[in-house]
């Protein structure tokens, strides 16, 4: 079956690019099927365009509007969701770490413990339980305001006067 061009770009090129983005090593070997209507409005047929019915990799499905869909196993989708959640959590931690370090902590771990405690408190009190909705910079500024002893103050640092060695 010939896959027509969609908006000047062939669907095969689009599918190959999508496959590469999904980390599929051999995008030319992916399974591609076309979803076709039948006389029965409750039934559709799948026509194999490329690849194999036995392929375990995600399948690419082309609908009648030439839109490309990806069909995958539930395990793969759950793995993807877990990976995204881990990445979001890691990103949040990195942003928190950066915000703490920007405020010159005396002991990073002490500030981290206070920050985690404050985050737990805010999540418990909030209707929205989304960790990502917490303004990290404001959180650290609030900690610095309420616990100034955890942070260095630039005015407290002693520098030798200029011109002396």
From Swiss-Prot:
InterPro entries: UPF0763
A matching Pfam family: DUF2603
Family per record: Belongs to the UPF0763 family.
Protein name: UPF0763 protein NIS_0363
Organism this protein belongs to: Nitratiruptor sp. (strain SB155-2)
Upper classification of the organism: Bacteria, Pseudomonadati, Campylobacterota, Epsilonproteobacteria, Nautiliales
């Amino acid at each position: 079956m010939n896959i027509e061009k969609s908006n000047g770009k062939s669907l095969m090129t689009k599918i190959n690019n999508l496959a590469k983005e999904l980390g599929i090593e051999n995008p030319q070997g992916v399974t591609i099927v076309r979803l076709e209507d039948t006389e029965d409005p409750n039934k559709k047929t799948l026509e194999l365009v490329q690849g194999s019915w036995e392929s375990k990799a995600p399948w690419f499905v082309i609908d009648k509007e030439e839109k490309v869909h990806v069909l995958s196993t539930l395990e793969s989708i759950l793995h993807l969701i877990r990976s995204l959640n881990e990445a979001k959590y890691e990103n949040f931690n990195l942003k928190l770490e950066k915000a703490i370090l920007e405020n010159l902590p005396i002991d990073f771990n002490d500030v981290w413990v206070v920050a985690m405690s404050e985050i737990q408190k805010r999540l418990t009190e909030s209707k929205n339980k989304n960790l990502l909705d917490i303004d990290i910079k404001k959180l650290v500024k609030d900690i610095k305001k309420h616990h100034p002893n955890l942070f260095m103050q630039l005015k407290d640092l002693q520098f030798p006067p200029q011109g002396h060695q």
